Amino acid sequence: MSSSLASRRSSSSSAAKRPAAGEGGGKAAAGAAAAKKRVALGNITNVAAAANNAKFNSATWAAPVKKGSLASGRNVGTNRVSAVKSASTKPASAISRHESAPQKESVLPPKVLRIVPTAAPAPVTVPCSSFVSPMHSGDSVSVDETMSTCDSMKSPDFEYIDNGDSSSVLGSLQRRANENLRISEDRDVEETKWKKDAPSPMEIDQICDVDNNYEDPQLCATLASDIYMHLREAETRKHPSTDFMETLQKDVNPSMRAILIDWLVEVAEEYRLVPDTLYLTVNYIDRYLSGNEINRQRLQLLGVACMLIAAKYKEICAPQVEEFCYITDNTYFRDEVLEMEASVLNYLKFEMTAPTAKCFLRRFVRVAQVSDEDPALHLEFLANYVAELSLLEYNLLSYPPSLVAASAIFLAKFILQPAKHPWNSTLAHYTQYKSSELSDCVKALHRLFCVGPGSNLPAIREKYTQHKYKFVAKKPCPPSIPTEFFRDSTC
């Protein structure tokens, strides 16, 4: 009884508050309320894409290192290696700290809603002093209880609607909302077409500044260009001979060199050495072979001695001499390894700092990742895989390390996106190589990549088929590279 009485009082109060108006005024009031009241959106929704439940085996592959001398078959101590492996074995579910957790697929992009505004009716002017805020009114009015009536009446879109009138205007309210609120499918199509046809930042002939981070001292932004020029000059002085196999070595051939390097890759994986150690080891071997004839029985001794020097130069905790003796199944004694180490150091005149393809690759990967659409880790790991394959090929010594690194970036980008030109003005500026200058080296690396699965030197390929390297060695590669990619005018 009391509630119905309060409702009637509220209705009469609202009727008194609304100024007298004709039929046209009533329609205007109903129109204003129709524009103000929110109607639930019926079927306008976005459906999230189904989550990708595929799981990956995160167990990493450990390269089996064999014992024995190089001449007898490249063996590694089985007892010691198995003990090291069993002690360092981790659960199969462990994920490398470099790996990112699997992410769900992104949801569908929301549709663009175009709301067409309609002309608001003329505001109703009422003196503010004659109104009191309706704290618990039964009318159909959307107003904050903390807002004073005087403030609300200042809005030209505000007007009271009685309960009796709300039922009569509900149908027109629905129609008005459907007319005013509509989804523009044409705009979606136009925006999608514009984004597809618009050139990406890498396709526009502009040079991106990659040395603009002056806060990180490790990037050396102010000295980066000078450091690069110094490395380019040093690589010519500390590069091995390109024909020592034909002119100097009589008992060693390129195939034996490749077998030695393939074995050293396994040793580096076994002792978890950094990549720079492997690249420096190969550099020391080739520089020593460029001026010293050696027989095949001492080739493995040269390899472990050079890796010992490189590990001392690059590693925080380098393996001991005894460990390198053990890894050869004690084919060589400790004194022999130290004697060969001294011979290498004296011949190289203790100039152990040498630019390798890995030095340039770090710089080039960072340049390639600027505004690039390729996944950062996939590009980095794929370029590293291609660069390590180049260590096995004796004929690639005819190219400087900077050119090999630039060609590895070129080929990695081509494998990830075969339809897109892999070179651009930014890479050409920072590498100082045009695409035409990379043609021969890229084709040689492409052949190495394509014959990788059938190679009898599987260490590098098996290394990069691990989950922590994103299985980049398993990526398919087109059988040929379009010739127009090597034309400078297309960059």
From Swiss-Prot:
Residues 75-91 have a biased composition (Polar residues). Residues 1-21 have a biased composition (Low complexity). InterPro entries: Cyclin (IPR039361), Cyclin-like_dom (IPR013763), Cyclin-like_sf (IPR036915), Cyclin_A/B-like (IPR046965), Cyclin_C-dom (IPR004367), Cyclin_N (IPR006671), Cyclins_cyclin-box (IPR048258). Residues 1-32, 69-106 are annotated as: Disordered. The keyword Cell division applies. The keyword Transmembrane does not apply. GO terms for molecular function: cyclin-dependent protein serine/threonine kinase regulator activity. Coiled coil: none annotated. Pfam families: Cyclin_C, Cyclin_N. Keywords: Cell cycle, Cell division, Cyclin. One of its GO terms (biological process) is G1/S transition of mitotic cell cycle. GO terms for cellular component: cyclin-dependent protein kinase holoenzyme complex; cytoplasm; nucleus. Belongs to the cyclin family. Cyclin AB subfamily. This is Cyclin-A1-3. The gene is CYCA1-3.
